[in-house]
């Protein structure tokens, strides 16, 4: 009898082992859908980005006009632009839910997969930041100026590093050109790292809601989870289409409809909504270098989570104290996001400082203590 080609062909075999015959735990919930949704978001962003790049001009004299030209004169340019802009928001919603799932169910104990995931997150944030500069509106220009200028806080090399990134003594045409280059290049680096992420994941196998080893109860990925993922795709595409067609500017800043003007500073300089929690942490520290370090550490702290895991149980499913802390962390992050969008005045300054301290306390102090306490309670 002839062997099935999907199991013998060198290339198709890889796809088969990753998407068809992959042994998958039988009890993984909808929270495991976000990995595939992120893959869909990445494909949508790359495709819409390629079509936008065909019509975009990376020069300060014509960048703003070229975006207007895309929306007004290019066939379905408005749809491509709206899908790309709102696709970034959907991407970050899925990323944050994916990370939250990993924290809740202890997926971070698969260390290689988790660490690659954190690197992907950093690259994703870099891609989104440089992409936000490209329309060359007021918030694009001032956001680029403020955030890149933070690097000048680094001792010895700071000023040189900022001028090197700017390509001059201010954010100018050279800056825009290199930011466009990075925005074009980085998604493909993310694709490569996603492959590595999946490689490490399939090396160890997926986690499941109980956090227990599920080798004795696995089912093939197709048809069970492939159809489940398709349902997720339709739901995501519905929300993305709704955003792009009905409220395309819901999540954008009105300031960005004004062409960049170095002589006029916007009343409130703030990034897109998905960076506001980190921006709030940055602003809550009066010292410039301290703020930059806190900003970096707000993301890099995820690398410490596997090291600080003290519980005998992997998942939070049977750990009520840690569950409470987890949801308090979620609430705290939402508060930080709200504070990041508010002006720098009381009471927002104090709330931001308290929320920043508690954000780091959850990871460094409260979760390890809760894990240790729950271990003690198991022995009662």
From Swiss-Prot:
Pfam families xref list = Cytochrom_B_C (PF00032), Cytochrome_B (PF00033)
Which Gene3D superfamilies does this chain map to?
Cytochrome Bc1 Complex, Chain C (1.20.810.10)
**Main localization (coarse):** mitochondrion
Alphabetically sorted, this entry's keywords are:
Electron transport, Heme, Iron, Membrane, Metal-binding, Mitochondrion, Mitochondrion inner membrane, Respiratory chain, Transmembrane, Transmembrane helix, Transport, Ubiquinone
Q: Name one GO biological process term.
A: mitochondrial electron transport, ubiquinol to cytochrome c
Q: Which domain of life is it from?
A: Eukaryota
| GO CC annotations on file | mitochondrial inner membrane; respiratory chain complex III
One GO MF annotation is: metal ion binding
The UniProt record gives the binding positions of a ubiquinone as 202
Q: Which of this chain's residues are annotated to bind heme b b566?
A: 98, 197
Q: How does it sit in the membrane?
A: Multi-pass membrane protein
| UniProt function note | Component of the ubiquinol-cytochrome c reductase complex (complex III or cytochrome b-c1 complex) that is part of the mitochondrial respiratory chain. The b-c1 complex mediates electron transfer from ubiquinol to cytochrome c. Contributes to the generation of a proton gradient across the mitochondrial membrane that is then used for ATP synthesis.
> What else does UniProt say about it?
Heme 1 (or BL or b562) is low-potential and absorbs at about 562 nm, and heme 2 (or BH or b566) is high-potential and absorbs at about 566 nm.
Q: Which family does it belong to?
A: Belongs to the cytochrome b family.
Supply the name of the protein: Cytochrome b
């Amino acid at each position: 009898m002839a062997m099935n080609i999907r199991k013998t062909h060198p290339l198709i075999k890889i796809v088969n082992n990753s998407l068809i015959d992959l042994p998958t735990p039988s009890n993984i919930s909808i929270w495991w859908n976000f990995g595939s949704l992120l893959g869909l978001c990445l494909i949508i962003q790359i495709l819409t980005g390629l079509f936008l790049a065909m019509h975009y001009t990376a020069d300060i004299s014509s960048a703003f006009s070229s975006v207007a030209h895309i929306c007004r004169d290019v066939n379905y340019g408005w749809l491509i632009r709206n899908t790309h802009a709102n696709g970034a928001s959907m991407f970050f919603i899925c990323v944050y839910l994916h990370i939250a799932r990993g924290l809740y169910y202890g997926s971070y104990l698969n260390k290689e997969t988790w660490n690659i995931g954190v690197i992907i997150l950093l690259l994703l944030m870099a891609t989104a930041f440089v992409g936000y500069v490209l329309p060359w509106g007021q918030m694009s220009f001032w956001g680029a100026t403020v955030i890149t200028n933070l690097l000048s806080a680094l001792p010895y090399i700071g000023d040189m590093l900022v001028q090197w990134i700017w390509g001059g003594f201010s954010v100018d045409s050279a800056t825009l050109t290199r930011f466009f280059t990075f925005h074009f290049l980085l998604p493909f680096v993310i694709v490569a790292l996603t492959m590595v992420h999946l490689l490490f994941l399939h090396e160890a196998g997926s986690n499941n809601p109980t956090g227990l080893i599920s080798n004795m109860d696995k089912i093939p990925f197709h048809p069970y989870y492939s159809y489940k993922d398709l349902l997720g795709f339709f739901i995501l595409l519905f929300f993305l289409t709704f955003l792009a067609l009905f409220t395309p500017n819901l999540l954008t800043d009105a300031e960005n409809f004004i062409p960049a003007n170095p002589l006029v500073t916007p009343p409130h300089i703030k990034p897109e909504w998905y960076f506001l929690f980190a921006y709030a942490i940055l602003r809550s520290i009066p010292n410039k270098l301290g703020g930059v370090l806190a900003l970096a550490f707000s993301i890099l702290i995820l690398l410490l989570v596997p090291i600080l895991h003290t519980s005998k149980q992997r998942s939070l499913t049977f750990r009520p104290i840690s569950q409470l802390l987890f949801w308090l962390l979620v609430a705290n992050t939402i508060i930080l996001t709200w504070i990041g969008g508010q002006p720098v005045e009381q009471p927002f300054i104090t709330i931001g400082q308290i929320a920043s301290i508690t954000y780091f306390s959850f990871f460094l102090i409260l979760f390890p203590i809760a894990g240790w306490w729950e271990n003690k309670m198991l022995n009662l």
